[in-house]
Amino acid sequence: MNFDLTPEQDQLRDAVRALGRRYGHSYFVEKAKSGGHTTELWEEAGRLGYLGVNVPTEYGGGGGGLTELAIVCEELAAAGCPLLLLVVSPAIAATVIHRHGTDEQRKRFLPGFADGSLKVVFAITEPDAGSNFHRLGTVARRDGDDWLLSGRKCYISGVDEAQYVLVVARTEDAATGKLKPALFLVPTDAAGLTWSKLDMEIVSPENQFLLYLDDVRLPADALVGGSLDAGLPALFAGLNPERITVAAMGVGTGRYAIERATEYTATRKVWGGRSIGAHQGVAHPLAHAAVQVELARLMIHKAATLYDAGRDLEAGVCGNMAKYAAGEAAALAVDTAVQALGGAGMTTEYGVATLLGAVRAGRIAPVSREMILNFVAQHVLGQEKSY
Ligand SMILES: Cc1cc2nc3c(=O)[nH]c(=O)nc-3n(C[C@H](O)[C@H](O)[C@H](O)COP(=O)(O)OP(=O)(O)OC[C@H]3O[C@@H](n4cnc5c(N)ncnc54)[C@H](O)[C@@H]3O)c2cc1C
């Protein structure tokens, strides 16, 4: 058993931490409140190779694994910049294309993931299907060599910033019964693709959208893997990277909140000479949150290590557990930090209440805590499936 990062991973952690701190939470919040995007941070991280750490070197990437990408997600979040697009683009989309794309799709897309110049967002959720992906109603039908895609998607993050959307659909002849997904790379400027912004109670420069696909015409090579049989394994390939990186973001956010709070409570004095952090009523909840965050962090390391060793099934169990634990720990840490700061906790200036919406959403998306508990009950505890 080894709990140490390699020297290269340590260097990556330090370098990403330094970059994140240079931008910081006030940059993130200012972009969110002015309707902007974190373009400068994304582009700089891309130039420095941090967004492509998990892309193979032959395509210009860092040749690392999910461990490296999780480090990038955690450290940017720990600096107050939790970037959701890291989860959808380099974690989900790049992995799907790397593992299940055709040679031509790898050559075409992976270099853009390697330097961050390409953003591909991910669209699976639908209004009438929700957590039940077997009910997906977005349909792809053949028209000569082309495909025509029609359907609706909801809560899709970052469409306005991306060049492509990776759309999960089903073919016309597989319109009922168990999902046989087909994944398509849809350019965001394709005719027939439109979107409208959802008003969300989350302070973030990354937004969610309703997506409308009305007979979007796509060439044959838009189908990931070039074959309908590639759909299901391609969809599954994205799940572990998604769970693990979103968990890393949660842990980073939890660390950020605890750091803000402990800086404050160590120096704030309202009862004579001792800091409020000397009072166990203030310090213990923070210590409890720190324990939860660190436990989630351990599970992320285990999940990423298993994934990078090619042990996908075990990584799936640990990745789900890590995502659950990190979602709970992040929500606890931010809420506890707000309380420890008192009134200052609710101000924009102290930069913790600004994360309340994001960490609350982290218990719902990209997979809800209940669906993870269903997975654990079924696959770890051997219980009958209820749905
Ligand atoms: C900030 C944010 C960003 C998102 N970004 C994306 C994105 O980029 N791309 C994308 O495709 N989607 C995205 N989503 C959607 C997200 O993945 C879904 O919201 C999530 O999967 C839950 O689906 P739902 O909202 O339809 O909830 P529903 O499926 O309607 O569920 C509602 C509630 O019921 C519970 N529930 C449902 N079924 C069961 C069951 N069998 N057992 C126990 N409990 C159950 C759920 O856990 C949940 O609490 C995003 C959502 C948010 C909030």
Report each predicted region and the residues it spans.
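Flexible, small-/acidic-enriched active-site or ligand-binding loops
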Residues: 135-137, 189-217
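A short, Trp-centered hydrophobic/proline-enriched beta-strand micro-motif
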Residues: 116-124
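Alpha-helical interface subdomain recognition
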Residues: 1-79, 83, 100-105, 112, ...
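A short, charged helix-loop
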Residues: 209-237
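Helix-loop "lid/cap" segments that line or gate small-molecule binding pockets
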Residues: 91-100
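Short glycine/proline-enriched turns and hinge-like loops at secondary-structure junctions
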Residues: 64, 132-134, 158-162, 177-180, ...
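A short core secondary-structure module
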Residues: 150-195
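Short Ser/Thr-interspersed hydrophobic loop/turn segments at strand-loop and sheet-helix junctions
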Residues: 49, 72-77, 169, 186-190, ...
